[in-house]
Amino acid sequence: MTASERIILLVEDNEVNRDMLVRRLQRAGHKVATAGDGEAALTAMREQQPAVVLMDMNLPVKDGWTACREAQQDASIAEIPIIALTAHAMEEDKHRALEAGCSDYATKPVDFPDLLTKIAAQLDAHH
């Protein structure tokens, strides 16, 4: 499966941020699906089996922390790597994301080249 055939699920409730990231990911050759909250993210993960999930942590309905923990407890999606996206840049926030089951962590505003490197690392590690 090529990178262009693998779906990246972007979970972001801010429409401006979501649209900007979708455009940039598509320009980088990725197929992108979106969800606007943690509950919708879990549903999309089960239905679409994305290669990687980019998950904002501050989401309505169900926050990213909770969605990550629940994904880890669901055998059908537990192996899907999740990269946490958050404005919280403290080391304890990174530790919290990893404890919740995230595979990696990126801060906002997003350093796009760094994010692409993190995505590539997860794709290589899991496929």
Locate each region found by the language model:
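Conserved acidic carboxylate
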Residues: E12
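Charged docking surfaces used in two-component/phosphorelay signaling
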Residues: D19-R27
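C-terminal output helix
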Residues: V22, V110-I119
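Acidic, metal-coordinating helix/loop segments flanking the phosphotransfer/catalytic sites
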Residues: T34-V52
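Active-site residues of response regulator receiver
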Residues: D56, T86
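The feature encodes the CheY-like receiver
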Residues: P60-V61, A78, M90, P109
